[in-house]
Curated annotation (Swiss-Prot):
Compartments (UniProt record): Cytoplasm
Primary location recorded for the protein, binned into one broad class: cytoplasm
Annotated protein name in UniProt: Protein RecA
Protein's job: Can catalyze the hydrolysis of ATP in the presence of single-stranded DNA, the ATP-dependent uptake of single-stranded DNA by duplex DNA, and the ATP-dependent hybridization of homologous single-stranded DNAs. It interacts with LexA causing its activation and leading to its autocatalytic cleavage.
Domain of life according to the entry: Bacteria
PROSITE patterns given in the database record: RECA_1, RECA_2, RECA_3
HAMAP family given in the database record: RecA (MF_00268)
A GO term for molecular function: ATP-dependent DNA damage sensor activity
Residues engaged in binding ATP: 65-72
Keywords: ATP-binding, Cytoplasm, DNA damage, DNA recombination, DNA repair, DNA-binding, Nucleotide-binding, SOS response
Gene Ontology cellular-component terms listed: cytosol
UniProt KW Cytoplasm keyword: yes
Family, similarity comment: Belongs to the RecA family.
Gene name of the encoded protein: recA
């Protein structure tokens, strides 16, 4: 770039920063602070699948799946993790179905959690926007998009047609919310339901409610499915769950996490530590026995999990080592011309 153009660009950048504030425009490679802050989901395998160690702050996230697949459980686990870090959380309960007893069992501080049960979709989204603009909220959950009913539909007759009303409402809300969430570094999670497209012969007939705007504005989209039941004898005590990262703007997408959701407990963290520890040779398995650093920790997976629950310091050590091994490191700077990049170590 010639000198005159450089001067003109510098003047334009100075004018923009003076008018709109520092950081309103920057060179993409300049700012090392652009690393996205994340909050753990409560599941180690999902944190690893996301590539950044959790869900990103200041972004929109969509979680969808069939009924009883663990969508609300996942968001409550994330709220509990955020509260442990001292963050403020809000839950917009459009379905009017939040169970405070279950939330408390998952570790949510219900006395500190802000809850709203709005009457209309517009009211719910206005509350979201007001909370985002306040700058005081770190995590917001909207449960669910399908329950965000436009005011015109609520006030109309039962058989009235309201084509595209909800999609238009959401599209407008996304345009307003995105900038406010970024400025206040607040994460907004939308829980969504699945519907079937009529007349689809080829491809996936499943779609999510509320039009296409949310799909475009979301930085992360998670598809959560129940793949089986966990039994103790004849009693079902939990779900085998698969979570697929369908869209990811902060790391590589299309990775999957397999985990267990235990009824009344949430994610089986110790089970994940055992499985990932064995896979990556941090935990040794000989027959039915599991051992760590040469010490036996249990015969059978259930006993090994109980041992880790009783010894949280060992569980924490295994968790930290797995995160160091498996989470994507920050992108290294490009080598200078003529230099060879260092060989990356594979795990």
């Amino acid at each position: 770039m010639d000198e005159n153009k450089q001067k003109a660009l510098a003047a334009a950048l100075g004018q923009i920063e003076k008018q709109f504030g520092k950081g309103s425009i920057m060179r993409l490679g300049d700012n090392r602070a652009m690393d996205v802050e994340t909050i753990s989901t409560g599941s180690l395998s999902l944190d690893i699948a996301l590539g950044a160690g959790g869900l990103p702050m200041g972004r929109i996230v969509e979680i969808y799946g069939p009924e009883s697949s663990g969508k609300t459980t996942l968001t409550l686990e994330l709220i509990a993790a955020a509260q442990r870090e001292g963050k403020t959380c809000a839950f917009i309960d459009a379905e009017h179905a939040l169970d405070p007893v279950y939330a408390k069992k998952l570790g949510v501080d219900i006395d500190a959690l802000l809850v709203s049960q709005p009457d209309t979709g517009e009211q719910a989204l206005e509350i979201c926007d007001a909370l985002a603009r306040s700058g005081a909220i770190d995590v917001m959950v909207v449960d669910s998009v399908a329950a965000l009913t436009p005011k015109a539909e609520i006030e109309g007759e039962m058989g009235d047609s309201h084509m595209g009303l909800q999609a238009r409402m959401l599209s407008q809300a996304m345009r307003k919310l995105t900038g406010n969430l970024k400025q206040s570094n607040c994460m907004c999670i939308f829980i969504n339901q699945i519907r079937m497209k009529i007349g689809v012969m080829f491809g996936n007939p499943e779609t999510t409610t509320g039009g296409n705007a949310l799909k475009f504005y979301a930085s992360v989209r998670l598809d959560i499915r129940r793949t089986g039941a966990i039994k103790e004898g004849d009693e079902v005590v939990g779900n085998e769950t698969r979570i697929k990262v369908v869209k990811n703007k902060i790391a590589a997408p299309f990775k999957e996490a397999n985990t267990q959701i235990m009824y009344g407990q949430g994610f089986n963290r110790e089970g994940e530590l055992i499985d990932l520890g064995v896979k990556h040779k941090l935990v040794e398995k000989a027959g039915a026995w599991y051992s760590y650093n040469g010490d036996k920790i249990g015969q059978g997976k259930a006993n090994a999990c109980n041992y880790l629950r009783e010894h949280p310091e060992i569980a924490k050590t295994i968790d930290t080592k797995l995160r160091e091994m498996l989470l994507s490191p920050a992108q290294p700077e490009a080598p200078a011309a003529g230099e060879k990049p260092e060989q990356e170590e594979e795990f």
